Amino acid sequence: MMHPRQRGAALNNNSNNDDTDAQKHADENGYPHLIVFDLDACFWNQEMYQLYDICESKDNIVDEKTNTVVGAVSGRTVIRMHEGSRKALTEYYEGKYPGARLATASSADTPLAVKIGQSALRNLEIAPGVSAASVFAIGWEKEFDGNMQIGRTPPLSANKAQTHFPILRKFTNIEYHKMLFFDDCNWGDHCAAVESQCVEPKAGLGPAIQLSLIHI
């Protein structure tokens, strides 16, 4: 797990006002306040538990036309974002979803799998010098990582509805029904569990769910 160093806040010192402004912009434009991505075989093409080596920048695969890192290498395996993921992050980086923020909810199996995933996020890019990790950090205070819930080591678990999402709710201060969750798990229904178990008391609603869109 990436432990949150600070509670959910915006980039400058006037965090409460910025949080309110961000939420207002999201509401005005009909966007969720928090867009949450599963990672393995959803955001990108690989399962981190099957890999054994941390991704190093010296091994990156760079697209010669765009000078952008399109592949992070773990051993002999290349980790690539799905085109839908790349498009979503690019549009977000370009400011097409004002007020929304990004997060991850990934139940990577082992501490090593978590580290490999984190290294892939640091190396993969949507534009020259713009890493996926840096896009996930947009809108949050420097050093805040409470939006990046990766792994299943306590307090996380394999059950995202019981751990990942309650932790995201706590550290981002964003209500469940104002979240959108992308997950295409084919061995269990994380989406249904999150939608039914993570319900905001006053609204009576859980996160909106989207299956498999990341592959488009």
Task: Report the location of each language-model feature.
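Asparagine/serine/threonine-enriched low-complexity, disordered tracts
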Residues: 13-17
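Short, well-ordered alpha-helical microsegments
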Residues: 113-114, 165, 188-191
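Surface-exposed intrinsically disordered loops and tails
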Residues: 146-152
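Alpha-helical substrate-recognition element adjacent to the catalytic core
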Residues: 3-9, 19-145
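Acidic, divalent-metal-coordinating active-site segment for phosphoryl/phosphodiester hydrolysis
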Residues: 183-199
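Short glycine/proline-centered loop/turn elements that form peptide/ligand docking sites
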Residues: 186-189, 204-212
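Conserved Lys-Pro-Asp/Glu-containing loop-to-beta segment of HAD-superfamily phosphomonoesterases
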Residues: 161-187
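Conserved small/polar residues in nucleotide/adenosyl-binding loops
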Residues: 214-216
